[in-house]
Amino acid sequence: MTPRRRGIIIRMKMNRSKQFFLSLAWLVSVHALMLVVLTVFRLVELTCLHGMITDHGASVVTAFVKGVWFDNVVACYISVLPLAVTLLAAAFGYAGKKLRKGVCYWYFVFSAIVFMASAANTPYFEYFFKNINSSIFEWFGYAATTAGMVFQEKSYILHIFLYFVFLAAYIVAMIYMRRYFDRRIDRCRRDDRFVLPVALRFIVSVCVVLLCLFGIRGRMGYNPIKISQAYYCDDPFLN
């Protein structure tokens, strides 16, 4: 093998290594962004319903920590498939823009659903004094009536407005993040100096996916996370 050919092969390996870690950094950033938006929805709920707190000795910080814990379970459900596909593709040398665009659409669709539930939880809790749950699917048989009730109730307008504002901000942030990492990945051909073999990239991919699956499980105990894990005080709102 000539020195020139050897140098070309080394540069290709360098490029793929940095593409892999940039792809991982992008996915972690997207996952973290989702958790930030969900936390903002919780802040809105606390601001709107803080008068419903009955146990004033209970820690609000603990409530938020447990909230992020449960939000991370939901986020991991959404992230596990794009994480596996993107990292395994990058491990074997593919980190194209089309793949990241497809992943963005995946997050847009499922995040919109999750954010909708988070936005609806505030008026739902105010009315029923409990968090939103699967019982809302019973309303789908009365879709027209339910929609009329929601949009005619003026107190819901704020939450509908905030939903679209936060969703739009999330989408814009996702687009800017994707473009930023697109540029970084395109430039990595010229400045990468770290080489990681395909086998090691594959192992790292598997470990990260397993970590995401652990996030879905939510805990290290015999049983996965349950709703009862949220209860830490006598206040229904903080729980």
Name each model feature, range by range.
Residues 92-94, 165-204:
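Cytosolic-side transmembrane helix boundary signature
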Residues 18-33, 98-111, 197-202:
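Alpha-helical transmembrane segments and their helix-start/interface "positive-inside/aromatic belt" motifs
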Residues 69, 73-88, 97-107:
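N-terminal helix-rich structural modules
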Residues 36, 201-215:
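Hydrophobic membrane-insertion alpha-helices, especially the h-region
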Residues 73-86, 161-176:
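Hydrophobic cores of alpha-helical transmembrane segments in multi-pass inner/ER membrane proteins
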Residues 41-71, 106-163, 184-189, 217-238:
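Membrane-interfacial interhelical loops
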Residues 28-46:
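N-terminal-proximal low-complexity accessory segments that begin disordered
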Residues 1-13:
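Short, Lys/Arg-enriched N-terminal segments with co-localized hydrophobic residues
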